[in-house]
């Protein structure tokens, strides 16, 4: 046995990220002890017997927790002046003009938004699922979307396929092709692929998805599933690779990298902490930030940093008491 001791705490080496951003806690409010001090004892190697997990029952949310859980944060200004909002302006911009512009303070983003007609904006916000509707005023094309981690299952091959074989499109499908009625939700699930421990096989899966995207005009694919198997009773476990963060990361990176070679955006989900199917819309998930960063978030982190994933599907649950799709620490800072 070799023992290694640190003479004194190093507060410098890991104080900033590679780009100089200060490393700070972002999920402190995900710890139940943040809301109810000294309620939960977390397992530690230094005291296995004294800190081994137990079931916590009969806990009552505090008034502060209830206020946040209610999520009643939208304030309606009865005296607002809608004339200050511009629709349908002629500013001569297209969405493509802002390709690569990541600075949201760039005034061109505001000018571009001013060009959108009210009706087009409402359609874009109100209709989703299998398609992000086109906005002609800014030349934003329709983007076909589909689920999920175990194969493309939201629509058949022919629903959005190009059936004009005279168009010059090498992926056009004859309108009489019997495969147009095929729904590609037939792949084995991610758990089975992960059990092979083969990144090569995961990459082959990605290639199949990418190739199919060309024939079906698929632009955005909601997969891979990068959550962990935190409990055997999670009905979404079949969409996630494993209980191990590193195995999940390796599989997801191979899959996404290979699939995106075909031009399809592959967006991992459900970000983050989706560990149940029943009541998953709104259930409050609590854990320490260490647990989140070292385990739960690793698969998505690798998908972005190592595979270059260009999209993410957020989860329906809460991060502590806050909704996952509105938690600033999770979505903006981490």
Protein language model features and the residues they cover:
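Glycoside hydrolase catalytic-domain context in secreted enzymes
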Residues: 1-334
């Amino acid at each position: 046995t070799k023992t290694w001791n640190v003479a004194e705490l190093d507060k410098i080496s890991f104080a900033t990220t590679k780009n100089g951003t200060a490393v700070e806690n972002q999920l402190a409010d995900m710890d139940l002890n943040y809301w109810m001090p000294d309620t939960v004892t977390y397992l530690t190697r230094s005291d296995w017997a004294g800190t081994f997990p137990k079931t916590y029952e009969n806990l009552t949310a505090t008034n502060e927790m209830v206020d946040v859980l209610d999520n009643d944060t939208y304030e309606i200004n009865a005296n607002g002046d809608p004339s200050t909002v511009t629709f349908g302006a002629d500013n001569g911009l297209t969405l493509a003009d802002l390709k690569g512009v990541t600075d949201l303070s760039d005034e061109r983003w505001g000018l571009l938004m001013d060009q959108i007609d009210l009706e087009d904006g409402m359609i874009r916000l109100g209709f989703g699922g299998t398609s992000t509707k086109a906005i002609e005023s800014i030349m934003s094309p329709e983007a076909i979307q589909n689920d999920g981690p175990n194969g493309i299952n939201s629509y058949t091959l022919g629903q959005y396929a190009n059936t004009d074989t005279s168009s010059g499109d090498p992926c056009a499908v004859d309108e009489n092709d019997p495969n147009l009625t095929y729904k590609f939700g037939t792949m084995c699930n991610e758990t089975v692929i992960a059990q092979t421990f083969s990144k090569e096989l995961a990459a082959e899966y990605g290639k199949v998805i990418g190739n199919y995207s060309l024939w079906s005009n698929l632009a955005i694919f909601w997969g891979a599933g990068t959550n962990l198997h935190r409990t055997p009773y999670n009905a979404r476990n079949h969409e996630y690779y494993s209980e191990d963060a590193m195995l999940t990361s390796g599989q997801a990176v191979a899959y996404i990298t290979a699939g995106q070679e075909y031009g399809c955006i592959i967006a991992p989900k459900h970000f983050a902490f989706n560990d149940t199917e029943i009541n998953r819309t709104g259930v409050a998930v609590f854990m320490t930030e260490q647990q989140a960063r070292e385990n739960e978030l690793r698969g998505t982190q690798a998908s972005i940093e190592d595979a270059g994933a260009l999209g993410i599907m957020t989860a329906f649950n809460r991060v502590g008491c806050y909704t996952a799709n509105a938690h600033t620490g999770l979505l903006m800072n981490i």
